[in-house]
Amino acid sequence: MRFDQSETFTAGYLLPPAAYDADNTPASFDNGTAQACTIALQVGAGGITFSGTNKVEFKLTHSDAESSGFEAVTIDDVVGVESVGAGGIVRALTAAHATPSVTLIGYKGRKRYLRLLADFAGTHGTATPMAATALRGKLDRIAPA
């Protein structure tokens, strides 16, 4: 038997779907009282050939306040990535990216608000399609102290 899970989570954008060629202005995402959050980072075929100079770094930050106090996440705050770079880098595009991809990043930190910056470096003459959707789950549970 299959079960419907659509009522067990809610979703919102950390990075609205668009073709980007420069940094986005991150909006605060309210994780509310959810006890789980998974970020689906979607990147289309690269508009350019990425390199160590012409790159995009996705930086995840979190805070207890909606508009201030944002700090970079660390490896202790996320699952699904091998490492977290300086400034909260959870994914970096530094080589050719010809095939669209989805990277799932589990947030297990204890902060209420999240922001995701697509930090562009170098020259990006052609935009790259991308988006990041946050899925809030375990809405009916209370976190342990």
Name what the model sees in each region:
Residues 71-80:
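Beta-propeller fold detector
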